[in-house]
């Protein structure tokens, strides 16, 4: 056969020279057809060439073998058999040829291989029956459709090898002409497998370079050579010092040692031999005081207030206290508190006493504020300490009883002994330690054990500069994986000779961890670096310390703690674990990269590849620290262990390299300096806390009483009360997103963007706690001019805005002005290091200003003020809408095609003149900005072409040099499938190629031709296995433990479970790579990449990838291109048109098909709702899970005549056959519904809407009247009179008939708990459903 042009189909006709069959040949074909009917095997199919078959017996000999019918029986008339040629129509032959046309390049004169239909029928020697059977053309083609590819060996060859004497006949008489029919399109070709063979992918192994060390490390073997020993100072030797602090901790009042004191950690300057050096130091600050503000009720005298305060203090055991009356301002969310200057009572008492109980009611006190403020917060605010800095400390007293691991330890009697140093001094050098451990599950698979620990040491690091990532030394400890396989004796000497000093081998894990704890104490690092240190490394270390009773475990921090945090099973208290690191700043490269670096894979080695970081090695092997499993055999030879240790050490170095690349140490330090919080908290990512401290410092300086830490609880209480009255308002509306004018635009698109929209709006309209009235009850609006000055300042004749008003706009203005000044300095700065510092400063200022609005809308922020947040977003919507309306007024030829929150896209209609586009943008900018004072719009970019698909989903060619010639372009993708990690690399590559052509094409015809040809080529290559395995890998993140996933629709969870069975480390948050192979269910088809590589029997499911991974994103990219249709694309790819097409759209369209006829077509609910989860509860007796299905229960009872006389219980355990309480089942059902709703709101897609609607429709039918139309009357009666049980307030069960009795209703008011629960759930989510009452009305 040969190929032809697209659009043609094939029509078959017999060649003129084909000879006719004689009678013997017809008999042979008849027998062959019987064989085809009886055989299900097609293994002996020749691949090509002449078909050879054994010579069949003649018709006469075959007839002799037939048994004679019994005497007296009339022979059954034998129907006339059709010949093969007669039984196959032209259409049948056409289908046959389509099925076996290999590709378009086969010559049309080739013979058709039909050997799979010709198999020898071997009759038994005793003369068995040889019944004749007819085979229609449809049956023939049905069997033909099940045939697979032919093997290379022929039947004749197999027969010869078996030793049988066979006669070979060449069937060259069945030849057909192939004529082209131009009216139809060709079928999809069936490509031959490529280099990948049967696996479905190309097996292309990248040669791996042997791993080797590239850095020179110091030869030290012990950390003691890196640190200064503790310096013992006698009392009186050092009374004043210069102290650089960077961390602090409050001593709880419940402890017996210095309760209510503070510990400051940092570096103390020490003079030695005329040189100043810095040693680690802990300063204990005693005699801290708490401050509480009390607002008297109107009409209460000061004496009454003082007396009541004294009574409260005496009741709580506060014996020492001071009370005085002061004037303060308040401007926040507690109702009833005056917002003008008011007289408050200030209570001060020692920090060793507990916080004051601020709960009322009180007789003369309206409210108590500040009781929840911590001593550490009061210290930072009152001493005006903003970030790490130098302190001049007087009255130092050397500590006799040391409680820290620092070289120096002092105490001071009062916080007033500390003051900020006025002279600007260089930051002291820091010591850094980067920690990397390798763990794997123990033999029982119960817990992680540590096999290798490596610490990279960095001495005398200037944190104001870029951090070097090559360490001064690396210390590494390793233990055997099995006690029966000790480590080689020459391991240390071998590693040292190879350039890796500092390696120590240990007999067991306890010796390894004891050594590690001691080394951390000797190193005395100021900063500890690690990848996922907080989420994994720290937790494992502390658990193993506890399990193995390591006495020096507290060297992980600088406080000599005696008690480890409490661990509850596998649960982790992250805050308690962080407390163990107090005094050492923790820099987690994983969490910081997630905050400051946008990618889809945050594994350390992946980040290093993306950032092009080298580390201290080159080359690679199959071992990845923290993921791979080490076997005793891998730790038996020094050479193999050396390779493993080198990888672990390299990961410790790469963590530092990632931190250095992101420059997060300098950035977080600058953010802390701006906000005035703790540096350690900024490193932990406490973004809202930074804004809280910035506002706390500001409002404290202005004599404002700030909100309590948990003021939102009070607010939520108000909301709960309003909800009961039905008056609770919905959450406020966010930014405006215009409906996009979807399509492909090839002219220039101008992008205008408001600079820092929300901070600018706060400045523009003076939106602040102090100016906006939230107490009047009316809708809040922009504050009028009279709200910009307080009464006291107005009485003093001061101008507006006064010092006590517009605090929030002033803070933002200060940040914006500072950033503008820094950017001005950046333009004239020449030194690279200074320029980097300025870049850090401006970035920190920008992040802080942009986060200011977030504290208003964040529910758990101390300064949460939803009315203000709503006012800001409302003004943002108005500003965007007015800009959209203004643009066509300024230039009627312009068209706004999209807008989102703070930006608009404008179609200019200009094709090739970038200067005209630039001038147009500058003109629009000037005219729009005339309308505002602080709000400013600017040109954010120019697009050469854009493909606009949906809201927040587009791809464009950005003109990077739009201010110049406009010849440089960069592709920008927002929100499309190709930027998500749950699409395989092949899908992303295909989409990228299609997108590049779409954005660069001249017309739609050119695009469609390319897309169809390209997708046809991709489909052929996928089926032929010409792509490598890495192209098919899908990665999904574990959001919970693999065991917690329910159902079979989570392939990554299935793969993760198998990884855990192989003792591989699997954690929540890990990306699980998997490949879909051939199989039935999706979860059964998913395999880890390494499983596929190691098992040649696993084959890539090419059809699944084409229809699920490639077709949908390409279809979405092209759906708005003129002339495109789904049928074109599916035909080019050779898949069914509906397969994978518009998955979300189709699900959304079918979502409303919840008619009674479409759902309830069976009496079995599981058949009506195959996708719904059945309801199962734990039996209260045997604790086994049992299904709940009342309708099935009734049907079972009615089917058994004997059981109808027994006591009937509707809910019975299927295992122990004991009855289940109705209210217990109702409670379990309610909890199940709430869990489904939680999962739905975490997803929220169209598919999730359909799923949750299906699930709750199933539940509604489960506990309602019989659901099937035509359900027997006796079943309905059983449901009504017996099965439908109602629970009364007297805890007695009633039937429906009894519940309908008015006398019973008056006494018991019975209700059906389960049906009531189903209806309650429906009311909560009725916006997702149709009217279900009408759905069940006709039953």
UniProtKB/Swiss-Prot annotation:
PROSITE patterns: DNA_POLYMERASE_B. It catalyses: DNA(n) + a 2'-deoxyribonucleoside 5'-triphosphate = DNA(n+1) + diphosphate. The keyword Zinc-finger applies. It is found in: Nucleus. This is DNA polymerase alpha catalytic subunit. Residues 1-90, 177-203 are annotated as: Disordered. InterPro entries: DNA-dir_DNA_pol_B (IPR006172), DNA-dir_DNA_pol_B_CS (IPR017964), DNA-dir_DNA_pol_B_exonuc (IPR006133), DNA-dir_DNA_pol_B_multi_dom (IPR006134), DNA/RNA_pol_sf (IPR043502), DNA_pol_B_thumb (IPR042087), DNA_pol_palm_dom_sf (IPR023211), POLBc_alpha (IPR045846). Polymerase alpha in a complex with DNA primase is a replicative polymerase. A motif (CysB motif) lies at residues 1243-1271. Residues 27-36 have a biased composition (Basic and acidic residues). The keyword Nucleus applies. In eukaryotes there are five DNA polymerases: alpha, beta, gamma, delta, and epsilon which are responsible for different reactions of DNA synthesis. One of its GO terms (molecular function) is zinc ion binding.
């Amino acid at each position: 056969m040969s190929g032809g042009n697209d659009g043609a189909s094939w029509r078959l006709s017999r060649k003129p020279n084909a000879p006719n069959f004689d009678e013997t040949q017809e008999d042979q074909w008849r027998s062959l057809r019987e064989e085809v009917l009886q055989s299900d095997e097609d293994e002996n199919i020749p691949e090509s060439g002449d078909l050879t078959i054994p010579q069949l017996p003649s018709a006469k000999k075959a007839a002799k073998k037939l048994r004679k019918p019994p005497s007296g029986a009339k022979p059954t008339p034998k129907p006339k058999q059709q010949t093969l040629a007669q039984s196959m129509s032209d259409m049948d032959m056409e289908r046959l040829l389509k099925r076996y046309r290999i590709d378009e390049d086969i010559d049309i004169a080739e013979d058709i291989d039909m050997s799979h239909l010709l198999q020898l029928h071997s009759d038994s020697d005793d003369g068995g029956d040889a019944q004749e059977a007819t085979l229609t053309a449809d049956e023939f083609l049905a069997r033909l459709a099940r045939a697979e590819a032919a093997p290379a060996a022929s039947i004749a060859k197999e027969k010869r090898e078996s030793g049988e004497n066979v006669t070979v006949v060449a069937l060259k008489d069945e030849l057909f002409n192939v004529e082209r029919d131009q009216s139809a399109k060709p079928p999809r070709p069936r490509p031959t497998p490529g280099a990948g063979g049967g696996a479905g992918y190309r097996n292309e192994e990248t040669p791996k370079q042997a791993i080797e060390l590239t850095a020179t490390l110091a030869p030290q073997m012990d950390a003691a050579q890196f640190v200064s020993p503790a310096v013992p100072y006698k009392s009186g030797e050092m009374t004043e010092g210069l102290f650089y602090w960077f961390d602090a901790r409050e001593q709880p009042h419940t402890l017996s040692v210095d309760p209510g004191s503070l510990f400051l950690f940092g570096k103390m300057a020490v003079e030695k031999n005329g040189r100043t050096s810095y040693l680690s130091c802990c300063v204990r600050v005693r005699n801290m005081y708490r401050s509480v503000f009390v607002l008297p009720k109107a009409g209460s005298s000061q004496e009454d207030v003082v007396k009541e305060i004294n009574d409260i203090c005496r009741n709580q055991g506060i014996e020492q206290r001071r009370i005085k009356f002061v004037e303060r301002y308040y401007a926040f969310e507690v109702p009833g508190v005056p917002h003008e200057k008011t007289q408050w009572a200030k209570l001060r008492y020692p920090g060793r006493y507990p916080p004051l109980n601020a709960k009322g009611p009180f007789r003369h006190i309206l409210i108590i504020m500040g009781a929840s403020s911590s001593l550490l917060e009061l210290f930072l605010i009152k001493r005006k300490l903003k970030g790490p800095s130098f302190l001049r400390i007087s009255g130092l007293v050397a500590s006799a009883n040391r409680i820290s691991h620092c070289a120096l330890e002092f105490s001071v009697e009062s916080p007033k002994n500390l003051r900020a140093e006025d002279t600007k001094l260089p930051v002291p050098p820091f010591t850094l330690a980067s920690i990397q451990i390798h763990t794997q599950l123990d033999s029982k698979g119960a817990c992680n054990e540590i096999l290798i620990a490596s610490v990279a040491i960095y001495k005398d690091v200037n944190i104001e500069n870029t951090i070097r990532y090559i360490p001064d030394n690396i210390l590494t400890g390793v233990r055997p994986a099995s006690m029966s396989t000790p480590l080689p004796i020459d391991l240390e000497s071998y590693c040292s000779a190879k350039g890796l000093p500092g390696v120590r081998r240990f007999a067991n894990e306890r010796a390894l961890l004891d050594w590690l704890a001691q080394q951390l104490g000797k190193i005395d690092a100021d900063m500890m670096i690690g990848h996922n240190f907080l989420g994994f490394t720290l937790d494992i270390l502390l658990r193993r310390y506890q399990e193995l009773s390591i006495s020096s475990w507290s060297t992980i921090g600088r406080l000599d703690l005696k008690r480890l945090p409490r661990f509850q099973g596998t649960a982790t208290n992250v805050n308690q674990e962080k407390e163990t690191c107090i005094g050492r700043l923790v820099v987690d490269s994983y969490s910081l990269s997630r905050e400051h670096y946008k990618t889809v894979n945050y594994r350390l080695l992946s980040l290093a590849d993306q950032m092009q970081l080298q580390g201290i090695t080159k080359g690679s092997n199959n071992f990845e620290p923290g993921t791979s499993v080490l076997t005793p055999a891998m730790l038996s030879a020094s050479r193999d262990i050396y390779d493993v240790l080198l990888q672990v050490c390299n990961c410790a170095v790469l963590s530092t390299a990632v931190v250095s690349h992101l420059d997060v140490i300098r950035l977080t330090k600058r953010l802390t300096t701006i906000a005035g919080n703790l540096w350690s908290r900024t490193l932990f990512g406490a973004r809202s806390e930074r804004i809280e401290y910035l506002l706390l410092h500001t409002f404290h300086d202005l004599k404002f009483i700030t909100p309590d830490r948990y003021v939102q609880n009070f607010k939520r209480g108000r909301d709960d009360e309003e909800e009961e009255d039905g008056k609770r308002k919905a959450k406020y509306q966010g930014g405006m997103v215009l409906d996009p004018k979807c399509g492909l635009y090839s002219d220039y698109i101008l992008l205008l963007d408001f600079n820092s929209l929300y901070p600018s709006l706060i400045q523009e309209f003076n939106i602040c706690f102090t100016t906006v009235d939230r107490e009047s009850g009316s809708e809040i609006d922009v504050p009028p001019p009279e709200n910009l000055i307080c009464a006291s300042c107005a009485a003093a004749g001061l101008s507006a805005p006064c010092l006590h008003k517009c605090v929030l706009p002033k803070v933002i203005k200060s940040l914006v002005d500072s950033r503008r000044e820094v950017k001005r300095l950046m333009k004239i700065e020449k030194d690279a290091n200074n320029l980097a510092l300025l870049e850090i400063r401006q970035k920190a200022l920008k992040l802080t200003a942009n986060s200011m609005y977030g504290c208003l809308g964040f529910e758990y922020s101390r300064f949460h003020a939803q009315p203000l947040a709503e006012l800001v977003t409302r003004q943002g919507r108005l500003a965007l809408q007015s800009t959209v309306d203004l643009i066509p007024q300024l230039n009627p030829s312009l068209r706004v095609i999209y807008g989102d929150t703070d930006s608009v896209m404008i179609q200019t209609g200009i094709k090739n003149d970038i200067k005209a586009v630039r001038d147009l943008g500058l003109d629009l900018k000037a005219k729009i900005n005339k309308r505002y004072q602080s709000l400013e719009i600017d040109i954010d970019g120019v697009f050469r072409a854009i493909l606009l698909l949906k809201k927040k989903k587009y791809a464009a060619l950005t003109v990077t040099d739009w201010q110049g010639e406009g010849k440089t372009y960069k592709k920008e993708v927002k929100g499309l499938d190709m930027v998500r990690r749950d699409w395989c690399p092949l899908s992303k590559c295909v989409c990228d190629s299609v997108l590049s052509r779409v954005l660069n094409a001249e017309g739609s015809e050119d695009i469609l031709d390319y897309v169809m040809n390209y997708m046809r080529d991709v489909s052929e290559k996928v089926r032929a296995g010409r792509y490598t395995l890495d192209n098919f890998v899908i990665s999904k993140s574990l959001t919970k433990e693999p065991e917690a996933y329910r159902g079979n629709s989570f392939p990554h969870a299935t793969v993760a479970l198998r990884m855990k069975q192989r003792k591989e480390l699997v954690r929540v948050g890990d990306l699980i790579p998997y490949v879909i192979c051939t199989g039935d269910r999706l979860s059964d088809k998913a395999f880890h990449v390494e499983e596929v590589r190691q098992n040649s029997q696993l084959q890539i499911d090419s059809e699944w990838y084409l229809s699920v991974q490639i077709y949908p994103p390409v279809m979405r990219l092209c759906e708005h291109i003129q002339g495109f249709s789904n049928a074109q694309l599916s035909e080019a790819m050779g898949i069914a048109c509906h397969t994978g097409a518009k998955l979300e759209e189709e699900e959304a369209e079918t979502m409303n098909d919840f008619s009674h006829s479409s759902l309830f077509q069976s009496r079995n609910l599981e058949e009506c709702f195959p996708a719904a989860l059945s309801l199962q509860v734990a039996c209260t007796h045997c604790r086994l899970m049992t299904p709940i299905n009342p309708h099935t229960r009734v049907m079972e009872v009615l089917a058994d005549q004997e059981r109808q006389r027994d006591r009937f219980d509707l809910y019975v355990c299927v295992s122990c056959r004991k009855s289940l309480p109705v209210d217990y089942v109702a409670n379990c059902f309610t909890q199940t519904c709430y869990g489904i709703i939680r999962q739905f709101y975490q997803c929220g897609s169209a598919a999730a809407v359909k799923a949750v609607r299906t699930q709750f429709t199933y539940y509604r039918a489960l506990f309602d009247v019989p659901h099937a139309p035509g359900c027997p009357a006796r079943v309905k009666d059983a449901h009504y009179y017996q099965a439908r049980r109602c629970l009364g307030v007297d805890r007695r069960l009633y039937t429906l008939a009894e519940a309908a009795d008015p006398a019973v209703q008056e006494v018991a008011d019975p209700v059906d708990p389960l049906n009531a629960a189903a209806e309650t759930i429906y009311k909560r989510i009725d916006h997702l459903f149709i009217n279900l009452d009408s759905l069940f009305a006709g039953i």
